[in-house]
Structures are given as C-alpha cells and as structure tokens.
Amino acid sequence: MDPFFLNTQHVELLVSGKQSSPQDLLGIVSESLNQDRIVLFRPGAETVFVELRGKIQQAESHHSGIFSLPVMKGISPQDYRVYHQNGLLAHDPYAFPLLWGEIDSFLFHEGTHQRIYERMGAIPCEIDGVPGVRFIVWAPHAQRVSVIGDFNGWHGLVNPLHKVSDQGVWELFVPGLTAGACYKWEMVTESGQVLIKSDPYGKFFGPPPRSVSVVIDDSYEWNDSEWLEERIKKTEGPMNIYEVHVGSWQWQEGQPLNYKELADQLALYCKQMHYTHVELLPVTEHPLNESWGYQTTGYYAPTSRYGSFEDLQYFIDTMHQHGIGVILDWVPGHFPIDSFAMSGFDGTPLYEYTRNPSPLHPHWHTYTFDYAKPEVCNFLLGSALFWIDKMHVDGIRVDAVSSMLYLDYGRYAGEWVPNRYGGRENLDAIRFLQQFNTVIHEKYPGVLTFAEESTTFPKITVSVEEGGLGFDYKWNMGWMHDTLHYFEKDFPYRPYHQSDLTFPQWYAFSERFLLPFSHDEVVHGKRSLIGKMPGDAWRQFAQLRLLLGYQICQPGKKLLFMGGEFGQGREWSPGRELDWELLDISYHQGVHLCSQELNALYVQSPQLWQADHLPSSFRWVDFSDVRNGVVAYLRFADADAKKALLCVHHFGVGYFPHYLLPILPLESCDLLMNTDNTRFGGSGKGFREPEILTPEIARQEREAAGLIEADDESGPDCWGLDIELPPSATLIFSVTLQ
C-alpha cells in the first residue's frame, strides 16, 4: 500500500498544477511516533539529494516527481537542505510555517490593513533563522498559484503557493532568495487557463516589455528626520509647487537624468527659484511612456526608467535636506488593460468595476477600480501609505477625482448603472476617498492630500466628520480655465470677458484651493503658456509676467509646471528635455528672473498665504475699469488687518502716467514688485512714487479725468491712489490702512 503522501488525488492535483494546498503534502510530515518523512516534489528530476545535518543522502524516488526521505522524529527545517538541478543547495520551502494569520485576514478582507505592503508581495525576511523571501498574493478564483523566476527555471510546478484562507490569499516562503531576484505569478484559472502575471504589490519591476517583478531590500538609511519632525508646522505656511516630469526636466548626453543625478540639481534649482515643493508626475511603474505615468501597473513601485528603488529614496531624502517637500501624483481611479498586470488578474475581473455595460472608461480605455470590494480599497490605501511610510513623500495628489465620484463620468445614458438610490454618485468611491483621507491624516499628521476635481461636487476639502471628502486642497480648475481663457483673448476683445477674472472670486473660498498652471494646459495643441499670449514678442512676454504675477497674488496655493517659469516656447513633450538654451535669450532671462522674484515675494509675504482660504484675506478695490482691463484688490494676513498688499493688474496695452484707484484711507503705500521692470524685459514704467489722495482731492481728479460729473453726488467720496500704470503688468504695493 502506498504511503499517504502518494495519495493519487493529491499527486494528480500537484502534477496537473491544480494543487491549492501543497503544504499539506510536502515538507516534513509525521509518519509514525518515531519517524518523520521529508516529502519533496521535483518535476522532471531523476534523482534528488538532501544534505541532512551535514550528511548527503539520496531521497527515495516515487512516481510523478515525488521524492521522500525518512528521518528521525523532531527534525526541523534548518536541519536539511535540498540540491536542485541547477546545483543550488537550499532549504525546503514547504518545511517552514505559514505566517499569514487571522488578524491579517480580518483586516485585509475588511479593507483596513494599514501595513498591507509589509505582508503582500515579495517580502525579504528570516524565518527560524533562515533568510529568504516570503511571497503572498490575493487570487481568490485561481485553482493554483505559483511563484516563478530564475531560481526555479520559470517552471510553474516547482513552487506552488499554499492557499492560506478560503478568501483567496496564497503564501510561500522561498529560503535563500535575496534582493534582486526576478519573479512573476503563474496561475491556473477556474477554466484551466494558465496566466503569467506581474505582482500587483511588487516593489520594483524590470523594464517593459518583460516587466518582471523584482525583490527589493528596503535598507536605505534616511537623513531627513529633522524635516519629518518639522513637517506638520509647514502645512500652514506658503506653498509654491513646481510640477516636474522626471524624464523631461533635464537631460545629459541624450538621456534623462536619473533620480540621483536629478536630486541635487533640482533641489538647488527649487531653492534658487523659491519653490517650497516639487510635485512629480507619477513615478509609479507604468508600461507606456506616452501615458506620462498616469496608466499605472506598479502601484507600489517606482519606475525603473530613472534608477533603482533606493535611488528614488535618495532623491526624496535630498529634497528634504534642502527644505523642499515632495508631492506625488497618484492614480487610484483607473488602471491599464495590459494583460501582464492586474486586468483579469486571476481569470476574473478581480480589480475591475463590472456593473456598466462596458467595463472600459470611455476617456482612457482603461479599467476603473471596484471600490465595493474591501480588498481593492485596501490595495489602493496600502499603496498611498506605502509611499508615505517607505518613500517619505509629503503629499499625494489624487488624479481624476471626478471620474471616481460619478458613475456616469464620460458616459451617455444607457452606458452606466445608477447607484442603489438611483443617483449618479459612486457611493463606494466616496467612502474610499473618505477612508483614504481619514487614515492618512490620523496616521501621518502633516502629510497633505490634493484632489484634481473638475466639477462642483461639494465639500471636497471639508472634513469627513462634517460630511466632506477630507482633502486638504482642491485644484481650482475653474479658475485656471477662466484665467487662461481670458489671457488667450486679443486685447480689443478682453473687455467682453471681464467676468473670467471676477467670477472665480464668487467661489474662491468655498473650498481650500490650489491654483494650478499644470502640464495638462501645455500639451495636445493647447500651446505653451507663452504661446497662448496674443501680440508680438514683447507683449507676449509682458503678458506672461503679468500672468505669473496674477497667480501669485490670487488667494490659493500655487502650482506651475516646469518650463512656464522661463517661457518655454514649444509645447511640453515627455520625449525631450526642456529648452534650457532659451535662457541665453534676454526675454526668457527676464521672465525667469521675474518668476524668481515673484516667488520670493510670495514666500516672504504672509498676506499672500497665511489665510488664503478665508474671505477675510481678500477685498476688492476696483474691477469697474473694464475698458482698460484693470483690476485691483487687497490681500490680508489674519494677524494684522491694517497691513495689506495692494495688487494691481493691468491686462491692457495702454500706458497711464497717472491712474487713479479708489482706495480705503491709507497711511502709507510702497511699491514692492513691478513686472514691467527693465530687468525683466519690461519698459521700466510704473516706478513713480504713488500719491495718496484725500477724498476731496480724489474727487477733483475724477472730475478732471471725466470719470464723474461735477454735480454727481451719488455715493460717498473715497480716498484715491494715484499710480503710474505700465502696460500689461502686475504691481504689488505694501500698504498700511488707517
């Protein structure tokens, strides 16, 4: 009679690649009161040798690749190693205990495992004194899951994982493996199809098209403890973000700078230009360069295009040591259809949302995530926490939030299924975003979250406790659209579009806003910022300086995509570096210097950032001069209502040696910034000392200018400020109110 481990059914499942419980059959099994037996499976092997406590013994051969060796009772996994066909001598994977526990299962299947990145995927560890790599994956509909790699000849029958929960978690410890080992998952689906998949929880990947997962050893020694300790204090400070695509900021010898090369250069540049943060277009792994990183396949992995896992850690560490925060673009709304990654992961739409007639998103032809599954939410939440914990990022900007919030986003009637109340809101996505923000803010105070949200969905930046989504900031897409729409108009037509400047103030304090001029506005035929400006070269550059000054003065945090600060002429392309040679041209030098000094003024002026989400930080002075395109307003810090900045923007092309503004009673007025400075390439006008006029004198000036009739008694008289107003310029004054 054959021993139990040769049970025909067990062996058939093992040999056919459908065994879900290899740990029950293989490893050290008890044979009697006095004897154990080591049972091995080596498909294709004729002989197998075992080193047992220093002595080499040949295992007994059975049928179908099963080998065994009788041993004394109480043998341990450390006591023996097995010779493989490639000559490798290693401990037996099936002799070691399984570590995925009930608490892991409870938290993961509830969607609340906050350290899932230390449990799932390939985790280097030591079990019973033996080093190796523990592999864990979620594939509930697979009949068999194996880890394949160079270490087993990419043979799917050699290392099948053990199904450790009835909800589809699989585990195996492979002794002797170290960082750098390449691997993938091989799965047998319910229908018998064999799939080869990259690891959704993989921490690093080889380059496309192979896209193998790579084991990493996270042993980087950080030097940013002082930054992390002080980070929470910086959240209410100035925020001037430089948006960067790593692969096209600067090149060397025809290739993009890698993470390490970029680190010092970009950090010094940001300090020189007075940026407080960089925001990186996604550096998560992605197969397609042209997606700019927004079609992610490695949610836990930095892209290998620009260096190693440790190289990106070095980059972030270096930025912190120079006082620059790092924000990461992150895409939890959709993922690509590439068959090697998450799509149809275990033979079923495991991560995909399937309730709509077509599972593909009409805008990007990608899959959307199924937020109704706790495990999918845990996967995404774990990704965000991984980047904060292991990579020390200071903020996460969530891409395409609108597409997550609405079931009908980009879809016509009949192409989507309403929620259980008959509405269009994705209730599961809303719950996920609330969980995302709640966990991050509780676990990592000082880390900021940003929503790129283009609709009027309410309470984006209201706390979860008050019924909001809980983001720290929302991108003000309406302000960006209206502002650029106005600037693109030729000067004679601007008076008909004055509302583009004034309307955004009606909702400017309904959320905590960030004002972006992002990468999306300088691609796909939209033209660069300088290319949007009407007129000849002088007027274009004057308008760009005016635009940058306007952004700095408006209430809200700031973001500018790389190249905008020096007037990049061509549209951005991810396949080439910025046109840095333009800085040899005076116009570009001028706008670059202007941007630098505007940034410096911003970070040094609490009136521009200290209370920029409160209505009390902004007060109109005048927006009635539609014909000449002049608007003026005051900006306040919450500490001193008498100290303010007066911001004056002239969107026209005329020059006014004497321009009279109605103003509150002033004690003093001093010019701080003039974008028409000759150092910036301007005409040098606007530097005459402003004159503060009493109501009586101001009225006389208005009568003389024909602004009011002599017998006009409508409304009270107000003080006036007589300034020299240059063409197409921003003027910023420091004023003290009476």
UniProtKB/Swiss-Prot annotation:
Pathway given in the UniProt record: Glycan biosynthesis; glycogen biosynthesis
Keyword Transcription on entry: no
Protein name, per record: 1,4-alpha-glucan branching enzyme GlgB
InterPro entries found in the cross-reference section: A-amylase/branching_C, Branching_enzy, GlgB, GlgB_N_E_set_prok, Glyco_hydro_13_cat_dom, Glyco_hydro_13_N, Glyco_hydro_b, Glycoside_hydrolase_SF
Example GO BP: glycogen biosynthetic process
Enzyme Commission no: 2.4.1.18
Taxonomic lineage from the root: Bacteria, Pseudomonadati, Chlamydiota, Chlamydiia, Chlamydiales
SUPFAM superfamilies, sorted: (Trans)glycosidases, E set domains, Glycosyl hydrolase domain
Keywords of the record: Carbohydrate metabolism, Glycogen biosynthesis, Glycogen metabolism, Glycosyltransferase, Transferase
Subunit structure: Monomer.
